[in-house]
From Swiss-Prot:
It is found in: Cytoplasm. It comes from Pseudomonas fluorescens (strain Pf0-1). This is 3-hydroxydecanoyl-[acyl-carrier-protein] dehydratase. The active site is at H70. It catalyses: a (3R)-hydroxyacyl-[ACP] = a (2E)-enoyl-[ACP] + H2O; (3R)-hydroxydecanoyl-[ACP] = (2E)-decenoyl-[ACP] + H2O; (2E)-decenoyl-[ACP] = (3Z)-decenoyl-[ACP]. Homodimer. InterPro entries: FabA, FabA_FabZ, HotDog_dom_sf. Pathway: Lipid metabolism; fatty acid biosynthesis. Necessary for the introduction of cis unsaturation into fatty acids. Catalyzes the dehydration of (3R)-3-hydroxydecanoyl-ACP to E-(2)-decenoyl-ACP and then its isomerization to Z-(3)-decenoyl-ACP. Can catalyze the dehydratase reaction for beta-hydroxyacyl-ACPs with saturated chain lengths up to 16:0, being most active on intermediate chain length. GO terms for cellular component: cytoplasm. GO terms for molecular function: (3R)-hydroxyacyl-[acyl-carrier-protein] dehydratase activity; trans-2-decenoyl-acyl-carrier-protein isomerase activity. One of its GO terms (biological process) is unsaturated fatty acid biosynthetic process.
Amino acid sequence: MTKQNAFTREDLLRCSRGELFGPGNAQLPAPNMLMVDRITLISEEGGKYGKGELVAELDINPDLWFFACHFEGDPVMPGCLGLDAMWQLVGFFLGWQGLPGRGRALGSGEVKFFGQVLPTAKKVTYNIHIKRVLKGKLNLAIADGSVTVDGREIYTAEGLRVGVFTSTDNF
């Protein structure tokens, strides 16, 4: 059976409700913390390392919640939301691969910010390159990612780490 290789906003909302990968498995956050409108490509091959990739998008409009509070009179999307979106996508990749458990961001290596998302922007694109997936007692993905706004790269992150856990009692 061929896996679905693109996901709509409605698919992602189903994932946030726990309906895409099954109860107790990887979920995306619900709006307003869901930082992705669509996944245009997800693959177990390809990417910079040949081990998988995701491309996803967020449509920008001036009414998005964070522009009203970050910062008053100087609206900009918080960089941490772009970083969180990359973690969201790495976790989604694990669920899409059928690995059981709830996703948790476990850290990252170097993160660089060298641009910003303003209310005048049209589209943010996330590119995730899977470096490694560990399967076993701990299911973990390690990836590098980048964020572009209207075609210009503005953030990069190396060593994004996300695990899925069948129990988070001791986490």
